[in-house]
């Protein structure tokens, strides 16, 4: 998915019940969440004017907020209707959709009962991106946080600080992204995507209890099983990677993306078998446009 420049967007954004022209959608510089990363969000895709798995995304958005102690002033149904307004107002066909919940600018105290909870829903025009070329990874130096130190199933802005840093470092070193390990050294995920490995007709993927269990990840697992593939969720070590013939990552924006290689530092593992990933990609592309 390729996005156009933000300053070229002339759509309307839904903010706390109002449709606001994109160029007038602003927040105060003393907004609490801007200073303390106290916001949660979702990344969604609209295909042919319909957001894929909107209910699941909305339910997770609310759960993410509740995990941070935020009281969301809207129900699942109300948020879904707000999405529909954004899509209708902007005549959206294919787009990336970003709902965001954040604390207001009433106070900069770490906690304050008077802080407002706000919601916006924005659409960003997108175009399909070519997936002909696979991407190359290295093992990032930063590890995922211990699950009992942060709510890992909350899609919060704070969770992305390390991911952004890791991706920047990967790019600076000539890679496309970083493979991240958990606190025990097991394979976790990439910076913004979940990872799968392939051997024969079996998919292997890390257990999603130490990182966000992606909605695209869950969808791909369902598709794989429907296609007769076996899926094993396990603790995976770096030394196991050379036993696999294929590798790919999943995410809302990237959908299904082949991995060509992973640099382990002492050796580089390459993957030539993309048949299963391509099959899953094709089926996923069909389902999201139904």
From Swiss-Prot:
Q: Which Pfam families match?
A: Aminotran_4
- Task of the protein: Acts on leucine, isoleucine and valine.
Q: Which PROSITE patterns match?
A: AA_TRANSFER_CLASS_4
Alphabetical keyword list? Amino-acid biosynthesis, Aminotransferase, Branched-chain amino acid biosynthesis, Pyridoxal phosphate, Transferase
Please name the InterPro entries in this protein's record: Aminotrans_IV, Aminotrans_IV_CS, Aminotransferase-like, B_amino_transI, BCAT-like_C, BCAT-like_N, Class-IV_PLP-Dep_Aminotrnsfr
Which GO molecular function annotations are given, in alphabetical order?
A: L-isoleucine-2-oxoglutarate transaminase activity; L-leucine-2-oxoglutarate transaminase activity; L-valine-2-oxoglutarate transaminase activity
Residues that the record marks as modified (N6-(pyridoxal phosphate)lysine) are 155
Q: What is this protein called?
A: Probable branched-chain-amino-acid aminotransferase
Indicate the transmembrane segments per the record.
none
